[in-house]
C-alpha cells in the first residue's frame, strides 16, 4: 500500500492525492472538476488539436483537455453536489440574521433595565440587599443603652424591630449626615441593625437560627471593616482631598493611628481607582459581612456564610458586567480590583482594631460613653479553648510562685518514726506529738494533730504522706458475686443457668440435623472422628 506522501494524482501527477469523486486526485483537480461540472461543462474550448498534455506544471494551460482527462481517469460527475454550498450559505445567513436581531433587541431595550438579564433569584437577592443598605434607624436618643454590652444591644435592637418601636427610613436620599466620629454610637447601632437584618435574611434562606453569641462574634469581627468601608466611600466622593479627611477621621480614635498613614493611603487609592456604583456598593457591603474570620464563628454560621459568599460573588460579577455593559473579561478584571480592595481594607481594619485594644481592656473602669459596647467590638471575649488553657497555665504558674514562700516540710529521716499527719487543729492550745504507730491496725481518725506541722500554712495544702506502706496492715480481698449470680432467679441452680457444652454437642439430634454433619466436621475437625460413632 502506498504511503500518504507517495499517492499521485491520476489527472496531473501531483502529490499528495486522496480519493475525490472516485479516483486519486489532488486538491487542485478536485476543485477544478467540481467547478467544471457545475458551470463549465459546455463552455471549455481547446485552442489546439484537443490533445494537450496535462501535467502539474501545465494543467492550467487547457481546461478542456484537463476536464476530459478527469472524465477519462474515472471521476464521476454524479458525486458532485451543487446544493451543498447553498445549504452552507443558508445556515450562515440565518445565523447572521439571528445575531443581528439579538443585537438590535439589546439596543432597543431600556438601558436602565439591565436587571432583566439576571435570573429571578438573582433579582430577588439584589432587591433584598439593596433594601438593607438603604434602610437605617431613625432613633437619635441612645441614653438608654449607655451601660449595655454588645449582646444586650443586639437583643434590644431585635426586640425593638419586632415590637415596632424602632422605625426605619430610606437613608439613600436623606440629607442628614451621620456622626463624623469613626466610632460614633449612631454609626455602630446602624451597623448592628444592618448585620442583624442580614442574618435574619440568611436564616430564612437556609432555614437556620443563629445564636446571640454568633451574632456578637460576627459583629465584632466585621464592625471596623464596615465603618472603614463607609468612611472611604463617603470621602472618595470628594476626590483626592478626601484622603486627608479620612486620615483626620481615624486620628480621632483614642489611640493615634499615624503609623498606618501609608496603608490608609494605599487603600484609598485602590478604591478611588475604580469606585463602585450605588448597586455595587450595596452588594459589596454585604460581601464584607460574609468575609468574616471563620475561627470565631460556629460551624453552622460558617457554612451559611460560605454558601452566601459564593452566590454573592457571582451576583457581583453579573452586576458589574450588565450594569456597565462590559465583556466577561473586563468584568472579571473589575471584580478582581474590587475584591482586592475588600481584602486590603480588611487587613487595615484588623490593624486599626489591634492598635485600639490597649485602650479597651476588658473588666476595666469605663472611660468613655458606651465603653462596654466598644470593648466588646474591639476587644471581644475570647472563648477559644487553647487560649483559655494557656491563661489557666499562666495563672497556675503565678499561684505556684506565691506558694513557694511557704517553708516545705522536711522529709523524715531513718531515725524518726513515721506517723500520720492530720490537718491542723483550730484550737489555740498546744498539742503534743502522738506515740509511734505499732504493727497492728490503729484508728488514725481519732489521733490528735502534731505541733511539728507548720501552723502558718494553708489548711488546703495536703500534708506529707510517707511513700512506704509497710507499717499498715493489708486488707484481705473478698470475692464478690458475679453478674450471672446477681441475675439468676431465686431457686435456680448453677447448672441450669450456665451449663457448659459437652464435646459431642454437635452430635445431638436436636442441635445438629443429619444434613449438617459434614458442615460441622469442616468447621470442627477435632470432632469429625467422634461424629462417626454417634449416628444421627
Curated annotation (Swiss-Prot):
Gene Ontology CC terms, in alphabetical order = nucleus
Name of a matching Pfam family? zf-C4
Q: Identify the residues that the record assigns to the NR LBD domain, covering every copy.
A: 155-378
Mind telling me which SUPFAM superfamilies this protein's record contains? Glucocorticoid receptor-like (DNA-binding domain), Nuclear receptor ligand-binding domain
Q: Where are the zinc fingers (NR C4-type)?
A: 9-29, 46-70
Give GO terms for biological process: cell differentiation; hormone-mediated signaling pathway; intracellular receptor signaling pathway; negative regulation of transcription by RNA polymerase II; positive regulation of transcription by RNA polymerase II
Top-level taxon of origin: Eukaryota
- Key words, A-Z: DNA-binding, Metal-binding, Nucleus, Receptor, Transcription, Transcription regulation, Zinc, Zinc-finger
Task: Outline the segment boundaries, as ranges, of region: Disordered.
Answer: 427-465
Point to the regions of Polar residues compositional bias: 439-465
Q: Which InterPro entries would you find in this protein's record?
A: HNF4-like_DBD (IPR049636), NHR-like_dom_sf (IPR035500), Nucl_hrmn_rcpt_lig-bd (IPR000536), Orphan_Nuclear_Rcpt (IPR052496), Znf_hrmn_rcpt (IPR001628), Znf_NHR/GATA (IPR013088)
A GO molecular function for this record? Answer: nuclear receptor activity
* DNA-binding span(s): 6-82
**Where in the cell does this protein reside?**
Nucleus
Function according to Swiss-Prot or TrEMBL: Orphan nuclear receptor.
The UniProt similarity line reads:
Belongs to the nuclear hormone receptor family.
Q: What is this protein called?
A: Nuclear hormone receptor family member nhr-7
